[in-house]
Each structure stands twice: as C-alpha cells, then as structure tokens.
Design a protein with these regions (language model features):
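Phosphate/nucleotide-binding beta-alpha loop and adjacent structural elements of enzyme active sites
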Residues: 1-236
Length: 236
C-alpha cells in the first residue's frame, strides 16, 4: 500500500520521494554526513570572501569550528563583521598557497574574482590597485594551530586551487583532511576536473560528486563551472 501511494504521489506531483538517502550530488551536506564516520568538527573556508560560505557551514554544522582564510583586508573586515555572532569561528587574514611567503595581489574588478594565479594576478591598467599580503601553506598552518585533522577543506580561490593543495601535500599524504570541496570549470580561469584529479588521485583522494552547476554568463546555457567534492578513499 505504501509503495502504491508513493508511486501515485510521484505521478501526480512530478516529484521523486526518497526514504533514507538522496542521490549523490543532490545535497553536499547530506553526502558529507552520509560518508563521514564521525561528526564534522573542523571546517576550513579558503577564499572566504565576506563570510558567505562560513555562515552556511556554521548553520549546517553548528557544533563545528569554522576557520576562514581571507587575505584582502576589505573583504576580511566584512568577513569579521558578518560572522561576529558565530560561535567557534576564527578568521585569518592571510592566503593559503604553495609556500610561506609575502606577495602582492592585484584587484580585478569585483571582489569575488581576485586571484593569486600568476597569469591572472597582474595589473590590467596603470591604475590597478593592489595590496601586500601574506601566504602560508596548509601544512605549516596545521602545525601552527596544533590541529591534527581538518574534516572539510573548502577552496574557492579563482584558479589557484592547485597551489593551495600543493601546500597541503604532507597533510594530504598523511590523510589529515577528509573532504575537499572546490571550484572547477571549463574555461582557462578554472582548474579542470582532470588537473585536480591528476593531483589528488595518486595521494588517495577521489571525486565523489558535482554540485552547484552554473551555466555560462553569456546566456548560452552551456555548463561553465561547478563545485566538486573529493573524498579520501578510506571513506568510500
């Protein structure tokens, strides 16, 4: 009887009912909770911008510690302001990359598209503004924070993802990170899914699903970019 009613409901509404589990790729949080062997205790938000993702993860994982990394001072100040009411929240005013260093970041129009990638991080005009920032590696910061693991590492750094992962090679090899959620795309501005897989697969991280698929801004409706969840193979 229950199965009959389920089918009738689906026929009448055009909806699909799932009893215990959604299909992979439907909901990031659902997939992480399904795969994780323990509660999510630590989330790192790399390329935090003004706190949008930190607020989202704090709501979905209310008992976790959120660490946000944002090097640009104007974004960082708004990050602090927007997340001031969050418990267990820590903001860090530096970038994460392949080595510990200091560098200059050039501002590229909208604040969400600043990038440290060499071919993107350059002045577009004589009046292009810039800021001196610090860069640290994930391996260094994990040791500095005396943190043994990071459950979820989110990276949105406008094409600089491989460099961030390059600074986490030791931590990744030692499986100190469980989930990696990062932006991928089809044009040169984004890291390709193939390049990320080539980096992560040999050290034991495999792609699990795609999320937030976005069409090209020109309105042609072809796929432009999306987010990919990589999972350490022991959890699969």
């Amino acid at each position: 009887m229950k199965e009959f009613l389920k089918k009738k409901f689906e026929q009448l509404t055009g909806s699909k009912l799932y009893r215990n589990s959604l299909p992979r790729g439907t909901c990031l949080i659902h997939d992480i909770k399904r795969l994780s062997h323990a509660p999510i205790k630590e989330v790192w938000d790399v390329g935090a911008h003004q706190g949008e993702t930190a607020l989202y993860f704090a709501k979905k994982f209310p008992k976790s510690t959120i660490r946000s990394f944002e090097p640009v001072s104007s974004n960082y100040n708004l990050l602090i302001q927007n997340c001031r009411k969050l418990e267990n929240f820590h903001a860090h005013n530096f970038a994460l990359g392949e080595q510990n260093t200091k560098t200059k970041i050039f501002f590229q129009g909208a604040s969400v598209i600043h990038s440290l990638r060499d071919d993107l991080n350059k002045p577009s005009t004589e009046d292009t503004k810039s800021e001196d920032i610090k860069v640290k590696t994930i391996d260094y910061v994990l040791n500095e924070f005396e943190t043994t693991t990071t459950d979820l590492l989110k990276i949105d750094v406008e094409g600089y993802e491989i460099q961030v992962l390059g600074g986490a090679r030791k931590s990744l090899t030692e499986k100190k990170i469980n989930f990696i959620y990062l932006e991928t795309g089809l044009d040169d501005r984004f890291n390709s899914i193939q390049s990320l897989n080539d980096f992560l697969k040999p050290i034991g991280y495999l792609p699990y699903a795609f999320y937030e698929q976005t069409a090209h801004w020109t309105g042609t409706q072809n796929l432009w970019y999306w987010n990919t969840l990589f999972v350490k193979e022991e959890l699969l």
